[in-house]
Amino acid sequence: MSVQSTIKRKTAPEILARKGGEPVVMLTSYHAHTAALVDRYCDVILVGDSLGNVMHGFETTVPVTLDMMILQGRAVMRGSKEALVVVDMPFGSYEASKEQAFHSAVRIMKESLCGAVKLEGGVKMAETIRFLTERGVPVMGHIGLTPQSINTLGSFRAQGREESNWGPIEADARAVAEAGAFSVVIEAVAEPLAAKITKDIAIPTIGIGASPACDGQVLVLEDMLGLSPWAPKFVKRFGDLGPGIEAAIKDYASEVRSRAFPGPEHVYGMKKR
């Protein structure tokens, strides 16, 4: 017996078709409950390897494992219903060979049930992207500042701020598009360059510290909610939840210590005979 859902999720081809149209809205999520909230308003939910920083307190995304990504991908899939869920391929899961990348991507998609994967890199990863897409794996690219390369970059600095440095970044964008990616994240790239790339390539660009001209935007949820103590220049704080959460925890601790909580309304009495 076949089972058909009454709610249709967005797909990679549908996001590709948004090129030049209504901007694509994308946020990160790593949990079922935040995924349910994000799902109401976003086209794409990214299960980013930024979970290493946000959930686990790592200084970089390098320590994140494939199993960690799959586990949180499952949670986000259970919490969401309509958004396309994209799961990051973590450092070390795809760089060795295109075959390694395929096996990792298949694990992610089969075990999390997500709709696409994302990987970092341009020209050097084009062959891998093509290999995956030709075998049924939708791929979102990621160029510009690539956080998984922090140990070779040396710092999280914006890219392409001198026009003489534009060539390699433009080449990365073209390579990702021509390899069959359905979209590409452009991170921390000079605004004029990001706008030019958006105009020049045929797939949607998703900006993060890039340009309002991009075909969509993405932020880390905890950054835009004001839950992170520090956020990059490109983050706008759409909320300030950190102080409110701290105040609630402070009040809870105070009421427990003073025995004000739990009150009569929070406990169970005996059944009347």
Curated annotation (Swiss-Prot):
Record-level GO BP terms: pantothenate biosynthetic process
Binding site for Mg(2+): D49, D88, E120
Disulphide connectivity of cysteines: none
Regions that span the bilayer: none
Cofactor annotation comment: Binds 1 Mg(2+) ion per subunit.
Cell compartment(s), UniProt: Cytoplasm
Catalysed reactions listed for this entry: 3-methyl-2-oxobutanoate + (6R)-5,10-methylene-5,6,7,8-tetrahydrofolate + H2O = 2-dehydropantoate + (6S)-5,6,7,8-tetrahydrofolate
Associated pathway: Cofactor biosynthesis; (R)-pantothenate biosynthesis; (R)-pantoate from 3-methyl-2-oxobutanoate: step 1/2
NCBIfam families per record: panB, PRK00311.1
Protein name as catalogued: 3-methyl-2-oxobutanoate hydroxymethyltransferase
